[in-house]
Amino acid sequence: MRACPFRPAACRAGRGFTLVELLVAATALAILAAIALPAFFEQLARARRTDVQAALLEDAGYMQHYYASHDAFSGTPPPQLPFAQAPRQGGVAYVITVAVPPGDPSSFLLTATRAGGMARDPCGDFTVDHLGRRELVPGTFAPDRDAARCWR
């Protein structure tokens, strides 16, 4: 190590960061993370909601095609949904099921139930019926959410 009796600042510059500089950088990083992470996770949830909405609408189109071929939404063989989960690949965020009311083969209700990382999503579970009505399952969504806000 070289001696710097006349210029101590020049010697210190080559040794790295001070503790104060490190704490300032860590604080700045923590503030950025506190702001950015919730926004990132909300965007991720919105993308998963968009995936399930697209899958529900495609399944509804399939059910209409099934009705055109069988004159009923139920029958033999029963309709097998092309998309029983959303997203289509990867981890399951929603499970999609179809229900045909007994005695009314001319109607159906598709329901997407939250699963995995979306189990606590405030938008709740999504539904689409034979008339194309897009709703949320009552009791599954937060008080500040409604179908218009979640189905966009």
Predicted features by range, described:
Residues 12-40:
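N-terminal single-pass transmembrane signal-anchor helix
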Residues 46-50, 61-79:
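Alpha-helix exit/C-cap motif
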Residues 69-133, 151-152:
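Extracellular/periplasmic head regions of type IV pilus-like filament subunits
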Residues 1-17:
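N-terminal leader/signal peptides at the extreme start of proteins
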Residues 144-152:
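Short, low-complexity, Pro/Ser/Thr/Gly-rich segments in the mature regions of secreted, periplasmic
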Residues 41, 45-56:
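Membrane-proximal amphipathic alpha-helices
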Residues 54, 58-61, 130:
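Generic recognition of well-ordered alpha-helical segments
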